[in-house]
Amino acid sequence: MVNNSQHPYIKDGWFREINDKSFPGQAFTMTVDSILYEARSEFQDILIFRNKVYGTVLVLDGIVQCTEFDEFAYQEMITHIAMFAHSNPKRVLIIGGGDGGVLREVAKHSCVEDITMVEIDSSVIELSRKFLPTLSNGAFDDERLDLKLCDGFKFLQDIGASDVHKKFDVIITDSSDPEGPAEAFFQERYFELLKDALNPNGVVIMQSSENFWLNLKYLHDLKNTAKKVFPNTEYCYTMVPTYTSGQLGLIVCSNNANIPLNIPQRKISEQEQGKLKYYNPQIHSSAFVLPTWADKVINE
C-alpha cells in the first residue's frame, strides 16, 4: 500500500477531485482509509482506494469512475434505458466499461445472443476484477462475450458500412470524460460511426460527462451534435452521489425517429426486476423529465 501523502490526488488523508474546466470553484472529496493500488498504465493514471462509506473506489486520471456503494445507479441506467428502449436487442456493443458493470447488466437480458466489449486498457479490467469483483460479478466469463482490447473509435471505423451481420441493436458508450484521447467520443464523427454500426431500429446511449447543474450550454451543444446524425435524440439523467453534483446526464439516440425512447418497448418480468436496485419502468420515463429551466436550454 502507498502512503496517502505521496499521491498527487490525496492531501491530508483526503482524495480530491478538482477540475477547473468542468466544475470551477468547487471540488469533490472523500477520506482515504487505505490505498489498494496506484500506478500508471499505458493509457492513464489508476488509483484504487478504500473509503468507509463508499467502499472500494476506482479513480482514473483523477476522476471517480465508480464506487462499491453507488455504482449500480450508473450501470443500471446507462444499460437498461437503452436495452428496454429496443424491442428485442440480440447484439450489443459496449465501448469502454472496463470495470465490468455495464457488461454485468447487459448479461442480465436473456434475449441477448452476442455481446462485444471494446476496452483499450486491459489494466482496468484486470484491476477491477481483482479489487471490485462485484462490478462484473462473473460476467467476463459469459460465453456470449467477445472481448476486444483495442481503441473503440478505430473499432467503429473498421465496421464502417459492413454487412448487417456485423452490426448491433444496442451500443453503450461507457467512455472516459471528453479530455485527451477520449474527446473524440463526443464529436460528430463519432456519432456518425455509431450510426453506421447500428442495425435498423438500433439504440445508442452514452454518458455526457456533465449534468444540468454544471454546464447547460455543453449539454445543449452535445445533444445538437447528436441530432445532426440521429433523427431521434433525447437527454436523460441518473443520480449518483460520487459524480460531481450527484448527477450524470445520458444522451440516447436511435436511427428510427418513431421510437419513443422515454418509454420501455418491452415489459420487464418480475424475475428481471428482482435483480435490479435502481432501474424500473417508471424511472425509465421520469429520467427524461427535466426541470423547466434546464429543459428550455437543453431541448431548445
From Swiss-Prot:
<dbReference type="GO" id="GO:0006597">
    <property type="term" value="P:spermine biosynthetic process"/>
</dbReference>
<dbReference type="InterPro" id="IPR030374">
    <property type="entry name" value="PABS"/>
</dbReference>
<feature type="binding site">
    <location>
        <position position="119"/>
    </location>
    <ligand>
        <name>S-adenosyl 3-(methylsulfanyl)propylamine</name>
    </ligand>
</feature>
<dbReference type="GO" id="GO:0015940">
    <property type="term" value="P:pantothenate biosynthetic process"/>
</dbReference>
<dbReference type="InterPro" id="IPR035246">
    <property type="entry name" value="Spermidine_synt_N"/>
</dbReference>
<dbReference type="GO" id="GO:0008295">
    <property type="term" value="P:spermidine biosynthetic process"/>
</dbReference>
<dbReference type="InterPro" id="IPR030668">
    <property type="entry name" value="Spermi_synthase_euk"/>
</dbReference>
<keyword id="KW-0620">Polyamine biosynthesis</keyword>
<dbReference type="InterPro" id="IPR029063">
    <property type="entry name" value="SAM-dependent_MTases_sf"/>
</dbReference>
<dbReference type="GO" id="GO:0004766">
    <property type="term" value="F:spermidine synthase activity"/>
</dbReference>
<feature type="modified residue" description="Phosphoserine">
    <location>
        <position position="5"/>
    </location>
</feature>
<feature type="binding site">
    <location>
        <begin position="151"/>
        <end position="152"/>
    </location>
    <ligand>
        <name>S-adenosyl 3-(methylsulfanyl)propylamine</name>
    </ligand>
</feature>
<dbReference type="GO" id="GO:0016768">
    <property type="term" value="F:spermine synthase activity"/>
</dbReference>
<dbReference type="Pfam" id="PF01564">
    <property type="entry name" value="Spermine_synth"/>
</dbReference>
<dbReference type="GO" id="GO:0005737">
    <property type="term" value="C:cytoplasm"/>
</dbReference>
<keyword id="KW-0597">Phosphoprotein</keyword>
<dbReference type="InterPro" id="IPR030373">
    <property type="entry name" value="PABS_CS"/>
</dbReference>
<feature type="active site" description="Proton acceptor">
    <location>
        <position position="174"/>
    </location>
</feature>
<feature type="domain" description="PABS">
    <location>
        <begin position="12"/>
        <end position="255"/>
    </location>
</feature>
<protein>
    <recommendedName>
        <fullName>Spermine synthase SPE4</fullName>
        <ecNumber>2.5.1.22</ecNumber>
    </recommendedName>
</protein>
<dbReference type="InterPro" id="IPR037163">
    <property type="entry name" value="Spermidine_synt_N_sf"/>
</dbReference>
<feature type="binding site">
    <location>
        <position position="99"/>
    </location>
    <ligand>
        <name>S-adenosyl 3-(methylsulfanyl)propylamine</name>
    </ligand>
</feature>
<dbReference type="Pfam" id="PF17284">
    <property type="entry name" value="Spermine_synt_N"/>
</dbReference>
<feature type="binding site">
    <location>
        <position position="177"/>
    </location>
    <ligand>
        <name>spermidine</name>
    </ligand>
</feature>
<keyword id="KW-0808">Transferase</keyword>
<feature type="binding site">
    <location>
        <position position="44"/>
    </location>
    <ligand>
        <name>S-adenosyl 3-(methylsulfanyl)propylamine</name>
    </ligand>
</feature>
<dbReference type="InterPro" id="IPR001045">
    <property type="entry name" value="Spermi_synthase"/>
</dbReference>
<comment type="similarity">
    <text>Belongs to the spermidine/spermine synthase family.</text>
</comment>
<comment type="pathway">
    <text>Amine and polyamine biosynthesis; spermine biosynthesis; spermine from spermidine: step 1/1.</text>
</comment>
<dbReference type="GO" id="GO:0005829">
    <property type="term" value="C:cytosol"/>
</dbReference>
